[in-house]
């Protein structure tokens, strides 16, 4: 009650924030005549002056009115588009590191130019993050005209660029790209061997377009760079054959709500007989059990044309939120291979993680982060808790005129689809354009078939027909046009109403099913009613829809029976709509917990990742690695000598053991013969340093490259192994809950112990390698490439194989081709030697 009164008297927090910005908007408007008097050639000069002022210490906030006024005038001259006052407010919210919630058609792309130009003045780069390559290229080319007019450079990061092109794009004042490309470039940079090979130059300021899609919808899927593991793919086919013989409810049960499939006791016994083992849960059969469960999930929880499609002999994931294909992405943990076996296509080898990061932790690296979307308010709590981002609702330039009708709920899907087809036919006959939103490819193709039978012309936009996405969406507002689109395909493209459509009521949105997230439903509705245009929306539901079936449809079903509903007759009741909304809230809460749990676990990995990546950067950029090597040596010797330094004289066995470790780790017998007495720690230290000094003398200027090569090689090998061990720990840690232990705390504790052990193994490994080197030939070029450590050879033992490389789409290099490293020599005499 008090909160309500406070809000009534003082306005909401959002209102108060916008009110504070009004004087700044007035100041920008007051500068308009001054900016109008500038010649075109004066604009880059002004920007150069502002850059100089920033270098001299002037704050961006103080320059905001002038810069915003300059950008507004540039927009008028380049695009004949003047930023509205509400767009200036949106630009300020972004500059302040907030999420600007702006309705569809309010010009988010143009709004972003204001804070982008202001923050580009620092010279540290601004990243504009979009959901797909098409939007990145479109916005970079479109808004690039304005930036170039102002004398600022623009780069764009899309799939398929080489490192040189990426480095040039990141070197620009403003860089457009997708969240995946930015994240993967960060991971790839931390697998490079030389500082000059790095493409990114830090994380200063990012504006994330469709921020809800990127920071929430995609946050459940971490970015992973992986290399092929050694496991055979034959087991997947065998397990697939077994699962096909199982009967639901007899051999296994499925919980669709929790998305789990479990074998019954009868099923376990049946599988043991088919596989030919005594105990499926014996530790020796853990691989068989794992593959069997993945095959069970593939057959019962993942549906073709809903969760994935089969295209050109490959299983391609369908994004559950946008309905777009995600080529190159694969389900982890053997699930993708299980789907390949199910669909009888070629099974690719299972991958091993080489580097990974979640979007949450990647975007939290930016010094300042901001976002734009049409729908963020329902997720405001999550944005605040995880990213410390505040959502600001920006007023529309013109009042919203869209009418949102109550949901029409039917008993069965058949009744619902019949009603939808009839409604579309009636609207089409009247000439009113319709955008039909579906959750799956399956539904969109079913409706398309029904409309063909009734003779209603229409366009279909889903993951199978996405080539003309922007063109199809742009035409969706034309008179009599019917467009069927999965989810939010086509976001980012405005639907402009055709001639005479306003008089017919504008664009009608027809939702065929409620999504588990209210925000996705709101996004669909938001395609209509842009810039004060008329419009309408209605969702058609049935008790057989997944959301209704899994979350409380019994109450609604009982209510419909009491009301005496006839077949084909819908119910429109606020009570039912509220029940559906509550179901959505429960699902949203569940998904938030999943994302939060993922973040809790990744935070443990994130701290470790930061340590490893800092070590790598230091190794790449340090002019002299001598002090680091001496520090490593002191740590190694402290551990080696620990058994012999307990106070009492060490036994003969202890002395022998210490000598053995000195020989193994430091190759000390190269300069010192074992004796009944141990050398002092200082003597051992001097002996090892003498070996390194000899190496320095023999290799000259290449010494630093040799040290760096082996340090990075060992670091990468141990980190890759550690990631695999952490994956295994994570897989089994949930069982600790049965022993009254907190799985997260256990993961943190054990993960830290494993990390400490790994750091020590790195130090040991570096000395084990370096003290065994003998010089054969020294060519500096040999150390410029991780693949060719040809300048040195081991005097004892064998070199371990380098880490598996991530799958790349690069063409294979022939033995007689020029080497891609740029040396000018043939591949067979250079990196292919």
UniProtKB/Swiss-Prot annotation:
Q: Which SUPFAM superfamilies match?
A: Helical scaffold and wing domains of SecA, P-loop containing nucleoside triphosphate hydrolases, Pre-protein crosslinking domain of SecA
Reported EC number(s) for this entry are 7.4.2.8
Against InterPro entries, the record matches this protein to: Helicase_ATP-bd, Helicase_C-like, P-loop_NTPase, SEC_C_motif, SecA, SecA_CS, SecA_DEAD, SecA_motor_DEAD
- Tell me which residues bind Zn(2+): 819, 821, 830-831
* UniProt enzyme class: translocase
Q: What is this protein called?
A: Protein translocase subunit SecA
Using the UniProt annotation, give all residue ranges assigned to the region (Disordered).
Answer: 789-816
Membrane listed as a keyword: yes
- What family is reported? Belongs to the SecA family.
Composition bias (Basic and acidic residues) maps to: 806-815
Gene Ontology terms for molecular function: ATP binding; metal ion binding; protein-exporting ATPase activity
Which cellular compartments is it found in? Cell inner membrane; Cytoplasm
Provide the cofactor list for this protein: Zn(2+)
Q: Name one Pfam family in it.
A: SEC-C
Q: Which GO terms describe its biological process?
A: intracellular protein transmembrane transport; protein import; protein targeting; protein transport by the Sec complex
Instruction: Report the SMART domains cross-referenced here.
Output: SecA_DEAD, SecA_PP_bind
Under CDD domains, the record lists:
DEXDc_SecA (cd17928), SF2_C_secA (cd18803)
Keyword list (alphabetical) reads: ATP-binding, Cell inner membrane, Cell membrane, Cytoplasm, Membrane, Metal-binding, Nucleotide-binding, Protein transport, Translocase, Translocation, Transport, Zinc
Q: How does it assemble?
A: Monomer and homodimer. Part of the essential Sec protein translocation apparatus which comprises SecA, SecYEG and auxiliary proteins SecDF-YajC and YidC.
Q: How does it sit in the membrane?
A: Peripheral membrane protein
Q: Which NCBIfam families match?
A: PRK09200.1, PRK12904.1, secA
Question: Which reactions fall under this protein's catalytic activity?
Answer: ATP + H2O + cellular proteinSide 1 = ADP + phosphate + cellular proteinSide 2
- Gene Ontology, cellular component aspect: cell envelope Sec protein transport complex; cytosol; plasma membrane
Major localization listed first in the record, in broad terms: membrane
Q: Which gene encodes it?
A: secA
General function of this protein? Part of the Sec protein translocase complex. Interacts with the SecYEG preprotein conducting channel. Has a central role in coupling the hydrolysis of ATP to the transfer of proteins into and across the cell membrane, serving as an ATP-driven molecular motor driving the stepwise translocation of polypeptide chains across the membrane.
């Amino acid at each position: 009650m008090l909160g309500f009164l406070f809000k009534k008297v003082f306005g909401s927090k959002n209102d108060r924030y916008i009110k504070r910005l009004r004087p700044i908007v007035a100041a920008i408007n007051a500068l308009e005549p001054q900016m109008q008097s500038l010649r075109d050639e004066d604009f880059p000069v002004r920007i150069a002056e502002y850059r100089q002022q920033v270098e001299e210490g002037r704050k961006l906030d103080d320059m905001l009115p002038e810069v915003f006024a300059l950008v507004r005038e540039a927009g008028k001259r380049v695009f004949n588009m003047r930023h509205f006052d509400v767009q200036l407010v949106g630009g300020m919210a972004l500059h302040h590191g907030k999420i600007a919630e702006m309705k569809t058609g309010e010009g988010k792309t143009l709004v972003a130019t204001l804070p982008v130009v202001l923050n580009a003045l620092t010279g540290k780069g601004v990243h504009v993050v979009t959901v797909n390559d098409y939007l990145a290229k479109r916005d970079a080319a479109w808004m690039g005209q304005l930036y170039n007019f102002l004398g600022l450079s623009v780069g764009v990061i899309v799939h398929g660029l080489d490192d040189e092109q990426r480095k040039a794009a990141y070197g620009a004042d403003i860089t457009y790209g997708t969240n995946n490309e930015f994240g993967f470039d960060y991971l790839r940079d931390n697998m490079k061997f030389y500082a000059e090979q790095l493409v990114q130059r830090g994380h200063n300021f990012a504006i994330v377009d469709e921020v809800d899609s990127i920071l929430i919808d995609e946050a459940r899927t971490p970015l992973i760079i992986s290399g092929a593991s050694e496991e055979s793919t034959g087991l997947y086919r065998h397990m697939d054959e077994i699962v096909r013989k199982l009967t639901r409810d007899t051999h296994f049960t499925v919980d669709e709500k929790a998305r789990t499939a479990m074998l019954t006791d009868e099923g376990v016994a049946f599988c043991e007989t088919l596989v030919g083992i005594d105990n499926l849960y014996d530790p020796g059969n853990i691989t068989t059990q794992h593959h069997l469960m993945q095959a069970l999930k593939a057959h019962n929880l993942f549906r073709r044309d809903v969760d994935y499609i089969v295209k050109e002999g490959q299983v391609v994931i369908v994004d559950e939120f946008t309905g777009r294909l995600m080529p190159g992405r694969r389900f982890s943990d053997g699930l993708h291979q299980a789907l390949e076996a199910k669909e009888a296509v070629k099974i690719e080898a299972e991958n091993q993680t080489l580097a990974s990061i979640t979007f949450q932790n990647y975007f939290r690296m930016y010094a300042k982060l901001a976002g734009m979307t049409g729908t963020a308010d329902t997720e405001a709590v999550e944005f605040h808790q995880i990213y410390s981002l505040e959502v600001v609702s920006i007023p529309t330039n013109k009042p919203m005129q869209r009418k949102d009708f109550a949901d029409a709920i039917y008993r069965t899907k058949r009744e619902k689809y019949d009603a939808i087809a009839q409604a579309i036919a009636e609207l089409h006959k009247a000439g009113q354009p319709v955008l039909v939103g579906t959750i799956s490819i399956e539904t969109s193709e079913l409706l398309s078939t029904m409309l063909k039978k009734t003779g209603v012309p229409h366009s279909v936009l889903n993951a199978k027909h996405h080539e003309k996405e922007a063109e199809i969406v742009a035409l969706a507002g034309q008179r009599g046009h019917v467009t069927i689109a999965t989810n939010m395909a086509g976001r980012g493209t405005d639907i402009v109403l055709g001639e005479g459509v306003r008089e017919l009521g504008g664009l009608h949105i027809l939702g065929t099913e409620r999504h588990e997230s209210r925000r996705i439903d709101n996004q669909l509705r938001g395609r209509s009613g842009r810039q004060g245009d008329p419009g309408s929306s209605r969702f058609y539901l049935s008790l057989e829809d997944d959301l209704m079936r899994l979350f409380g449809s019994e109450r609604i079903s009982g209510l419909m029976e009491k009301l005496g509903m006839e077949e084909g007759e819908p119910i429109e009741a606020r009570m039912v709509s509220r029940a559906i909304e509550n179901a959505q809230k429960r699902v949203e809460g569940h998904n938030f917990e999943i994302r939060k749990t993922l973040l809790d676990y990744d935070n443990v990995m994130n701290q470790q990742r930061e340590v490893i990546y800092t070590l790598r950067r230091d190794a790449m950029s340090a002019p002299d690695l001598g002090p680091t090597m001496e520090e490593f040596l002191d740590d190694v010797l402290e551990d080696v000598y620990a058994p012999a330094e307990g106070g009492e004289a060490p036994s003969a066995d202890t002395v022998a053991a210490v000598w053995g470790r000195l020989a193994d780790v430091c190759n000390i017998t190269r300069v010192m013969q074992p004796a009944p007495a141990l050398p002092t720690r200082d003597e051992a230290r001097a002996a090892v340093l003498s070996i390194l000094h000899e190496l320095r003398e023999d290799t000259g200027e290449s010494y630093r490259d040799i040290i760096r090569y082996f340090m990075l090689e060992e670091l990468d090998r141990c980190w890759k192994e550690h990631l695999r061990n952490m994956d295994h720990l994570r897989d089994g840690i949930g069982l600790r809950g049965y022993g009254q232990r907190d799985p997260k705390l256990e993961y943190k504790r054990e993960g830290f112990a494993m990390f400490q052990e790994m750091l020590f193994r790195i130090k040991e490994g570096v000395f084990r390698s370096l003290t065994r080197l003998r010089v054969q030939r020294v060519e500096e070029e040999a150390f410029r490439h991780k693949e060719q450590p040809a300048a040195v050879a081991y005097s004892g033992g064998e070199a371990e194989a380098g880490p598996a490389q991530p799958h790349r789409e690069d063409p294979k290099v022939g033995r007689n081709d020029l080497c891609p490293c740029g040396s000018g020599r043939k591949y067979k005499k250079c990196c292919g030697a």
